[in-house]
C-alpha cells in the first residue's frame, strides 16, 4: 500500500485538527452540568454516556492524518483510565490546551525540544504541589464523598463506601446487572470460589440445597481421588474427631464419590467434595492460597506428598464453610496471620509487575479473597440504555475511590490544578523552556474554564477570582456559589489529577515535536463492473 507523507506545520496542523475534533466532543461532558454524548452502536440501542474514555474510543475520523491526532488523545484517556480509573475527560481537556498553546509557539519559531523540556519541568513541579496539598482519605464519609462526586449520585457513594468498609481497600468490588430496577449491594464474606458440590446428596439443608459445615477440616489436593483406599486412613482419623470434612480436589470419581455419598447419607460422617478452582498454574496458586488461609498443606506431587501418607495435621481448618451447587465460601480460615500477610504482599508485587490486564484482574481477585471478601453492586435501571450508562458511572466512581484511598484527595472541580499554578509560576526558566512552563500554566486553568462554560458561566471570570482565592476555595458549578470544596464534598483523588496531567503533557509534547507524519494513502474505489448486455433480456 502506498503512503502519503506530510511535513512540519502541515503534519502538525492535520493532527491538531483531529485533537480538536475529539476533545471538543469529549469536553462537553465535564463537570456537574456536563452534557451527554450519544454513540451509535453497530447493533442494539445507542449508548448515551458522559464517560470520556468510552466516547474517545468510539471516534474514527475519515482523514488519516486527523485520525492519528484523535487516536493520540484517545490514548491519553485510555492510559489515564488504566492508571487512575477516572479523570479521562480532564486529561483530554489538558491535552488539547497544551497542544493548542504549544502549536502557536512552534509555528512562531520556538524550538519544540526546548518547549518540551519546559513542559516536563513544569508538570513535575505541579505534581509535587498536588501531592503536598493532598488530604488522606481516612473515614467512611470521605470515601462516600469521592464516590458520590464521580458517579453524581449520593446513593452510589454510600454503596461503594459500605462495600469498601466490608471488604477492605484491597477487596474485590464487582459491578453486575440486577434483574430488578433497584440498585443494591451484596457482600460475600470470606474466600469464595466458583465450584459447587459434586453430588446433591451432600447438602445439609435440602430446602435451600446448600451444605453448611461448622468447624470443618479441609483436605486440599491437586490430585484426582478415584480410590477410597487412598484417603481411608485420613477419613478414620477425622471420624474420631467427629468434625465435618471439605474435600477440594482435581476431581472425585470412580468408587470414591459413591462411597463418600453413602457414608454421608448413613450419617457416618459429614463430608462435601468440590473440584479445585481455576486451571493450570492458576489452579496451583489458588490451592496454595486456600492452604495458607486455612493453615493446611496442598497434597501435591510437586512437594513429594501422597494422599495415602497424609495426616490430620496437613488439613486446613475454618470456622464455617458453605457450599451450594455453584460456589464454595470459606469463612474465618485458621491460617497463620503472618503467612497470610506475606502471601498478600507477594500477590501485590505480582500485580505491580504484570503487563497482562487479564492476569492483573485474576491477581486482584486472589488478593481480595485472601484479604476478606467480595462485594457485588447489582445495578438496576428501567431501560437497557440507562443500565449501561449507570454501570459506566459506577465503574468510574469505584476507580476514583480506590485512587483516593491510595494517594489522598484534593479540591475538585478543577480547583486543585488551579491551586498549583503559583508553584509552577515560581520556576526560574529561560528561553523556550520558559515558554513550555507558560503553556502548562495556561493549561492548568482549562478544566475550571470548561466546567464553568458547561454550567453556563464565563470561565475567564471564574479563573480570575480563583487565582486570588484561599487554598481549597473554589467554584461550585452546580450551584454557582464559591465554597470550601473539601467541606462541600467536591473532591478529586490526587492520583486522578496527577495522572491526567502527566499523560496529557506526555502525548501533547510528542505532537509538538512531530516533524513528519506517514499515513496510508486511501485506495481508489474500483468502478462498478459494466452490466453484460446479454443479461438485459426482455428489457431492450
UniProtKB/Swiss-Prot annotation:
EC number: 5.6.1.7
Task of the protein: Together with its co-chaperonin GroES, plays an essential role in assisting protein folding. The GroEL-GroES system forms a nano-cage that allows encapsulation of the non-native substrate proteins and provides a physical environment optimized to promote and accelerate protein folding.
Keywords: ATP-binding, Chaperone, Cytoplasm, Isomerase, Nucleotide-binding
Gene3D superfamilies xrefs: GroEL, GroEL-like equatorial domain, TCP-1-like chaperonin intermediate domain
Subunit and partners: Forms a cylinder of 14 subunits composed of two heptameric rings stacked back-to-back. Interacts with the co-chaperonin GroES.
Subcellular location: Cytoplasm
Protein species of origin: Streptococcus pneumoniae (strain ATCC BAA-255 / R6)
Main location class: cytoplasm
Identification of the protein by name: Chaperonin GroEL
Top-rank lineage group of the source organism: Bacteria
PROSITE patterns per UniProt: CHAPERONINS_CPN60 (PS00296)
InterPro entries recorded: Chaperonin_Cpn60_CS, Cpn60/GroEL, Cpn60/GroEL/TCP-1, GroEL-like_apical_dom_sf, GROEL-like_equatorial_sf, TCP-1-like_intermed_sf
Amino acid at each position: 500500500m502506498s503512503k502519503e507523507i506530510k511535513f512540519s506545520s502541515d503534519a502538525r496542523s492535520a493532527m491538531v485538527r483531529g485533537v480538536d475534533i475529539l476533545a471538543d466532543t469529549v469536553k462537553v461532558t465535564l463537570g456537574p452540568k456536563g452534557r451527554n454524548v450519544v454513540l451509535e452502536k453497530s447493533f442494539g440501542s445507542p449508548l448515551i454516556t458522559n464517560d470520556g474514555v468510552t466516547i474517545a474510543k468510539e471516534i474514527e475520523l475519515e482523514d488519516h492524518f486527523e485520525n492519528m491526532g484523535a487516536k493520540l488523545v484517545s490514548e491519553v484517556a485510555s492510559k489515564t483510565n488504566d492508571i487512575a480509573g477516572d479523570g479521562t475527560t480532564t486529561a483530554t481537556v489538558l491535552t488539547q490546551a497544551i497542544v493548542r498553546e504549544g502549536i502557536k509557539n512552534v509555528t512562531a519559531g520556538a524550538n519544540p525540544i526546548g518547549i518540551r523540556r519546559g513542559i516536563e519541568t513544569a508538570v513535575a513541579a505541579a505534581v509535587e504541589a498536588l501531592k503536598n496539598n493532598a488530604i488522606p482519605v481516612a473515614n467512611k464519609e470521605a470515601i462516600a464523598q469521592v464516590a458520590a462526586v464521580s458517579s453524581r449520585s449520593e446513593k452510589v457513594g454510600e454503596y461503594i463506601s459500605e462495600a469498601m468498609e466490608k471488604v477492605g481497600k484491597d477487596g474485590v468490588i464487582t459491578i453486575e446487572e440486577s434483574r430488578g430496577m433497584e440498585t443494591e449491594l451484596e457482600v460475600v464474606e470470606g474466600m469464595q470460589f466458583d465450584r459447587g458440590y459434586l453430588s446433591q446428596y451432600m447438602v445439609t439443608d435440602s430446602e435451600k440445597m446448600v451444605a453448611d459445615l461448622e468447624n470443618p477440616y479441609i483436605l486440599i489436593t491437586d490430585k484426582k481421588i478415584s480410590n477410597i483406599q487412598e484417603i481411608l486412613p485420613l477419613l478414620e482419623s477425622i471420624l474420631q474427631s467427629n468434625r465435618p470434612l471439605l474435600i477440594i480436589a482435581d476431581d472425585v470419581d470412580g468408587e470414591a464419590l459413591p462411597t463418600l455419598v453413602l457414608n454421608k447419607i448413613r450419617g457416618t460422617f459429614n463430608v462435601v467434595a468440590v473440584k479445585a478452582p481455576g486451571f493450570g498454574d492458576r489452579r496451583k496458586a489458588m490451592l496454595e492460597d486456600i492452604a495458607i488461609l486455612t493453615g493446611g498443606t496442598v497434597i501435591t506431587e510437586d512437594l513429594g506428598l501422597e494422599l495415602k501418607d497424609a495426616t490430620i495435621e496437613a488439613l486446613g481448618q475454618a470456622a464455617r464453610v458453605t457450599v451450594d451447587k455453584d460456589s464454595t465460601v470459606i469463612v474465618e480460615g485458621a491460617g497463620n496471620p503472618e503467612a497470610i500477610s506475606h502471601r498478600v504482599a507477594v500477590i501485590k508485587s505480582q500485580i505491580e509487575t504484570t503487563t497482562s490486564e487479564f492476569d492483573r484482574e485474576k491477581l486482584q481477585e486472589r488478593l481480595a479473597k485472601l484479604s476478606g471478601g467480595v462485594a457485588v453492586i447489582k445495578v438496576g435501571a428501567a431501560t437497557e440504555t440507562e443500565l449501561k450508562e449507570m454501570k459506566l458511572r459506577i465503574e468510574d466512581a469505584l476507580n476514583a475511590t480506590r485512587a483516593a484511598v491510595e494517594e489522598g484527595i484534593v479540591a475538585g472541580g478543577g480547583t486543585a490544578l488551579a491551586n498549583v499554578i503559583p508553584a509552577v509560576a515560581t520556576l526560574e526558566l529561560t528561553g523556550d523552556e520558559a515558554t513550555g512552563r507558560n503553556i502548562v500554566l495556561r493549561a492548568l486553568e482549562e478544566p475550571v474554564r470548561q466546567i464553568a462554560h458547561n454550567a453556563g458561566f464565563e470561565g475567564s471570570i471564574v479563573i480570575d477570582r480563583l487565582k486570588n482565592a484561599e487554598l481549597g476555595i473554589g467554584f461550585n458549578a452546580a450551584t454557582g456559589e464559591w465554597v470550601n470544596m473539601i467541606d462541600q464534598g467536591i473532591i478529586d483523588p490526587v492520583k486522578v489529577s496527577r495522572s491526567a496531567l502527566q499523560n496529557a503533557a506526555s502525548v501533547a509534547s510528542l505532537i509538538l515535536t512531530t516533524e513528519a507524519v506517514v499515513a496510508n494513502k486511501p485506495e481508489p474505489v474500483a468502478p462498478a463492473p459494466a452490466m453484460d448486455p446479454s443479461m438485459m433480456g426482455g428489457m431492450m
